[in-house]
Amino acid sequence: MSQEAILEKVRSIVAEQLSVEASEIKPDSNFQNDLGADSLDTVELVMALEEAFDIEIPDEAAEGITTVGDAVKYIEDKQS
């Protein structure tokens, strides 16, 4: 899956999970500061990404995923 395809899928999941417009979601958007996620939203978002991409994101890794771009890079690395 290309980086662009991953970004689009992540953007769609984030939009649905956080009830924000997909057009507002940029690679450098911070889940909490820019998109209004709280800690529970972040946990649910990680779970949704794990399910959508059929990967496991350990807690230590999840703590380092704070932006849309971080999520895309992590998923891209897991799939290669």
From Swiss-Prot:
User: Can you quote a single GO CC term?
Assistant: membrane
GO terms in the biological process aspect are: lipid A biosynthetic process
The UniProt entry, under InterPro entries, shows: ACP, ACP-like_sf, PKS_PP-bd, PP-bd_ACP, Ppantetheine_attach_site
Quote the SUPFAM superfamilies the UniProt record gives: ACP-like
Q: Which SMART domains match?
A: PKS_PP
* Keywords tagged on the record: Cytoplasm, Fatty acid biosynthesis, Fatty acid metabolism, Lipid biosynthesis, Lipid metabolism, Phosphopantetheine, Phosphoprotein
Record localization: Cytoplasm
Q: What are the GO MF terms of this UniProt record? A: acyl binding; acyl carrier activity; phosphopantetheine binding
Function of the protein: Carrier of the growing fatty acid chain in fatty acid biosynthesis.
What is the protein named? Acyl carrier protein
Question: What gene is it encoded by?
Answer: acpP
